[in-house]
Design a protein with these regions (language model features):
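Class I S-adenosyl-L-methionine-dependent methyltransferase catalytic core
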Residues: 1-155
């Protein structure tokens, strides 16, 4: 597991600003749940955490229990790429994704989002060399070797 650095997480959440207030959020490749839990602490209405790794799920559930989150939280043990095939734009306002770097997940998420939006907006963290040139036509913010890509669903 490669957790999002505090600096990147703070910049990410600050750039979401008031859009997070009352939002329905999905945290894909949730890992420890840091992004989704931060979204809840900043006013998200609900968060669905999607994680396939049993070890990460144990950590995620412990973190949720530690922070005392209530019924606005759901944990789904599933591969994120399979999960999004069944989600629709009306299901989530914001999708946060922090997939493993260098394995093609960031590209696959962006392509899937363009073909079938599974949220109103997608925010995906990836390494600076993880996207093909043809997939770089959206807002990107760089933090050293880390990039946050933001896409909006077409209306």
């Amino acid at each position: 597991m490669r957790p999002t650095s505090d600096r990147v997480k703070e910049a990410w959440m600050s750039s979401l600003g008031n859009d997070i207030l009352g939002a329905k959020v999905v945290d894909l490749f949730a890992g420890s749940g840091a992004l989704g839990l931060e979204a809840l602490s900043r006013g998200a209405k609900s968060v669905v955490f999607v994680e396939a790794s049993s070890a990460s799920l144990r950590t995620l559930k412990a973190n949720i229990e530690l922070l005392g989150s209530g019924p606005e939280v759901a944990v789904v043990k599933r591969d994120a790429m399979n999960y999004i095939k069944r989600a629709g734009r009306e299901d989530f306002d914001i999708a946060l994704a922090d997939p493993p770097y260098g394995k093609g997940y960031a590209e696959a998420l962006i392509e899937a989002f363009r073909d079938h939006p599974f949220a109103s907006r997608l925010w995906v963290e990836h390494g600076k060399g993880d996207l093909a040139e043809s997939l770089m036509d959206h807002e990107q913010r760089r933090y050293g070797e880390t990039v946050i890509s933001t896409l909006e669903a077409e209306r």
